[in-house]
Amino acid sequence: MNGHMSNHSSGYGIYPSQMNGYGSSPPYSQMDREHCSRTSAKALYEQRKNYARDSVSSVSDVSQYRVEHLTTFVLDRKDAMITVDDGIRKLKLLDAKGKVWTQDMILQVDDRAVSLIDLESKNELENFPLNTIQHCQAVAHTCSYDSILALVCKEPTQNKPDLHLFQCDEVKANLISEDIESAISDSKGGKQKRRPEALRMIAKADPGIPPPPRAPAPVPPGTVTQVDVRSRVAAWSAWAADQGDFEKPRQYHEQEETPEMMAARIDRDVQILNHILDDIEFFITKLQKAAEAFSELSKRKKSKKSKRKGPGEGVLTLRAKPPPPDEFVDCFQKFKHGFNLLAKLKSHIQNPSASDLVHFLFTPLNMVVQATGGPELASSVLSPLLTKDTVDFLNYTVKAEERQLWMSLGETWMKVRAEWPKEQFIPPYVPRFRNGWEPPMLNFMGAPTEQDMYQLAESVANAAEQQRKQDSKRQSTEHSSMSDYPPADGYTFSNSMYHRGPHVDQGEAALALKSTPNRHVDRNYDPVKTQPKKYAKSKYDFVARNSSELSVMKDDVLEILDDRKQWWKVRNASGDSGFVPNNILDIMRTPESGVGRTDPPYTHTIQKQRTEYGPRSADTPSAPSPPPTPAPVPVPLPPSAPAPVPVPKVPANVTRQNSSSSESGGSIARDSQRYKQLPVDRRKSQMEEVQDELFQRLTIGRSAAQRKFHVPRQNVPVINITYDSSPEEVKTWLQSKGFNPVTVSSLGVLNGAQLFSLNKDELRSVCPEGARVFSQITVQKAALEDSSGSSELQEIMRRRQEKISAAASDSGVESFDEGSSH
């Protein structure tokens, strides 16, 4: 229900008092009831709408709105936080860095106060008496939050007021602001009451009752508990029994798959792994935010003397509540599924390798286990089981402390499917992602077949999940297995939730996640066949909207890395690569001199290892790969050491790496073994390719050195900023310097003077490119001083000369200039 003018529990809005005659339903005669049963949906809709509009005068002055609490700032001049606009500016910076965590709640307005109520427990979180509300303002369409309600409140015990910001979706902020302002006006004892008229206006603007449907409602589908779960489980079990172990059909398919089919399958697994890492990172940050709120709440309770709640403690209590157990279970399942995917992809990803990602995941896994009070909840997560390859891979990869954590999780994390009884049902795992993304179907497998299998697995998984919830609910009535979780109001909070023995620090897992911001697997394969380098010139400016896109300027010359789709992957002269739409590019026949880097910089992006997916024809050489990390020298490793990153099997896959000598030295043995397995003519062709590429690279390097690597200057106007520059000019300047979208959106809201006032540490705290921004600002300041220094000096000298001349004329002494002219 999208309204607020209803006395139904499904919506939020003005509800009637029990004292005004609407608390109980009036008596109806038998004829009236028969007439009502025959009333059409449209007539019923009109009756309800008229009732909602006409009964405003008879309802109590209590209105409720569902809002999202964005953040709370202390208005302090030291923090440059004085007005609502300052708060909106800081909100934009936090939003650009992904640090805004919304909290759903109910905002209630009556004739005495504005209250914040917990959506689930209905407990009052905050209470702001109307006389403590200093300012109320609606802010629309200033950032990604398009309807913001700003409340400035200061209680007598506070030294500085608080600024509370709410996002209002169901009822717009301007209507809620009008309601609050009218309540404040009436509380001051005005002769004419404003609030009834304001409520009537709100009801007219948003009656809150949806129109009747044009067609009768469809028959609802059967729920998970209503479907024939046993038949579906039997069907799934029969299919699994026919196929045997889950690894067997995969191996069978691998023998028949073409390189393109395997590439598509690996690409899908890579996408699933990326979304799993995203969801785990989000959950860890959510845990960290809850821990921070709990820590702040504990400090406040220790410092204050009375038991009365202080300002802001209610919202802190709500934010300190940990996620529900179901979210912990989902996170553990994604950890297990992620380990399975890493074992499958260990030969196909690099920089970092699958082994590095295993070490990377064990730190947040340890934090989640601690947050649940121990390994009990994690050990109860049965599906998905780890595969045999995964168990072998982890045994070879994990360190001593990681192995200790792994062993503590029990047999559900150690035993493969073959070690469980055949009659025991293991529900299939269907991952569900926070953003609603679903893995793409594999076309070569047959969409109907795979879709049927997916739906079957999902229905069985839903049934198993429903059964698990019922079992956990039944167990919770007998004895609380999760005693460390607080009650619904969130006030009883156990320190053991976040502190249980000598464990890892609160932010360590989050820092581990932040340490590799670009840890996503590269989903893009190079074409199978070797092609000469292609270049294109951009016809227009293009600003990247995410990390996978690349910002380009008009007339930029770009190297084309992948042009198989509508968005082409290109590399600019600085070595940065990303996707741009192909309709802004013009193909160039010959590359301009000096364009493109032969040694692109090191990147932290996980890339797919270029390996042969199947037998290849003799006349199909492999293409040079995009920049992977230097391959390690194959040295025998102990069992606890990470698995070495697989290297390309074909020597034609020589890539432009920063340490090409180490790669060539470390790959001689592999190359010789590879050559022994190939025909002589095939070996010669590959050697010729390597020699040709080496000759071309040497030739390019020599010619570039002779030309002194002259890069043609583009006819792009130079963009500078001054202290008087507007935020739009600052944003344009940042884009022209090639900063990423996060930096542009974070700093593009500042004017020139505000940007110049920030030091390096402040810039680093706002955006990851803070050091580079500071250096560019320093250059701009120096340019301003060079351009305006002489004129300012002349102005100062002119004023000084006027003063000397005036003093000389009063005393009868000639000025310096006059004296020197004689």
UniProtKB/Swiss-Prot annotation:
Residues 680-698 are annotated as: Amphipathic helix. Residues 299-309 have a biased composition (Basic residues). SMART domains: PTB (SM00462), SH3 (SM00326). Residues 762-767 are annotated as: Helix bundle 3. InterPro entries: EPS8-like, EPS8_2nd, EPS8_PTB, Eps8_SH3, PH-like_dom_sf, PTB, PTB/PI_dom, SAM/pointed_sf. The modification Phosphothreonine is found at residues 223, 317, 629. Residues 766-785 are annotated as: Helix bundle 4. It holds the Pfam family SH3_1. Residues 752-757 are annotated as: Helix bundle 2. Residues 649-822 are annotated as: Effector region. Residues 64-194 form the PTB domain. Residues 718-738 are annotated as: Helix bundle 1. Homodimer. Part of a complex consisting of ABI1, EPS8 and SOS1. Interacts with BAIAP2. Interacts with SHB and LANCL1. Interacts with EGFR; mediates EPS8 phosphorylation. Interacts with MYO15A and WHRN. Belongs to the EPS8 family. This is Epidermal growth factor receptor kinase substrate 8. It comes from Rattus norvegicus.
